[in-house]
């Protein structure tokens, strides 16, 4: 008995034996799921079979065939899907929908014990060839996880999906375009000169001032705004709007996100409320007041202003511009900036600390400083670092 170590680091227990004069190999399981003690028990069972004239390899194959007759790829995939208890309901739905749309037609009814690497790869390559590289990459990861689950469940001895490594083109996720900070005065001038729908201009201005995500802004309700406390509370989830996809989305991090409102942001919200306050939604659609503003509205307006939203700047790029400016100023703590960006800290202890502490008072000062910085830049460009020298609210 020995432990076979593959180049990718996976480890398998193997037993060499002779049967009817032929050298054979028996798979005893995957390490560390199968411990040394477990492997020894399986070795001893195999030796007993040999002593009785039974080939343990043949018996195992026959047992596997009987065991896996009713175990299709779809059944095992759904079983694997159900083990991921930490997924949110929304994420779990998206994962299952992706499997249904892209894998189950080709693999769903296939016996999982008979699937080869080429079988698993075929539908994934079809997705890749359609240009959906990121979807293909996720399907490869999930197929590998499903087949690993099958190994761990004793349905198969080896994970053929491991051999798909490198077969699917990697997707280099592109950062959303953002303007160089020195072009902020130009951007502000174009926003001020925008002659389209006023609500669209206010959406752009507010996005720049508080740099929340598109869905966090578009699906917002007036009930989330506390004008007295100057705070916007974005909930983890919202009441879905009938017929509007993803309208239940709140904070992307799925925790309550508090957004302090500068005097400039409050002024914009008060203007919007004056005209559209009778509706539940803050940013209503152009043609239907019961539906939210389109997700393309901000970028469409930026294109009207003359910007290439794929190269120069897009609505999401405002977040990059704000983050760069706040960091460059040297005034604000990393935790305050990260919390305001609603980023999830990788370190779980750090994440818990940041979430609990909130850094709310520092963030109030920070967003007011950012709004004032934008106002100053309407006249001429001044860098965040230089502006921090003349406006440091932490010393006042």
Curated annotation (Swiss-Prot):
Gene3D superfamilies: 1.10.150.130, Integrase, DNA-binding domain, Intergrase catalytic core. Residues 71-151 form the Core-binding (CB) domain. This is Putative protein IntB. Residues 174-367 form the Tyr recombinase domain. GO terms for biological process: DNA recombination; provirus excision; symbiont entry into host cell; viral genome integration into host DNA. Belongs to the 'phage' integrase family. It comes from the Bacteria. The keyword NADP does not apply. The active site is at 213, 252, 316, 319, 343, 353 (o-(3'-phospho-dna)-tyrosine intermediate). The keyword Transmembrane helix does not apply. It comes from Escherichia coli (strain K12). CDD domains: INT_P4_C.
